[in-house]
């Protein structure tokens, strides 16, 4: 039903979201999320997804959320790693690591592209699981494998170490992009109803 009533790309709805006046909006009611809506100022579902991901503990603690805003406001600030594959992986997130899919792409395309598909997927999932837990031994083990894989495929060791530090810093709490996008869509839909059907919206909300 929502798809029949909601107009995506509605400027008034995005204005409401960007204002941070998000009481009643799905996954956006907390003061923390309100502040990030005002900072990121999303104007599409992908930028709204970034808000959902940005408020995760690991992303906040690592400073990646702040860096996302800085780079979004000034694209010239987005770093180049001197590697087309790395730059391409980070392109959709303004040069930052926001999602689990980003760390998985680093593993798949940089560390283990030479492996058969099944073995590559197993290794990438091992990376995802390792950084999602507190077991430092497993993190160090998969870190060595990641760095060895990267250097084997032409990435210098210093850059490989730096990439794994990025992964390790926020991987434990990095959000899944598909979940973030779904939350963002529902958030937009509830914002649309709040903006255009306020009586009905607040009747249900209250």
For the regions a protein language model found, what residue spans apply to each?
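Noncatalytic, beta-rich nucleic-acid-contacting surfaces in large DNA/RNA-processing enzymes
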Residues: 1-206
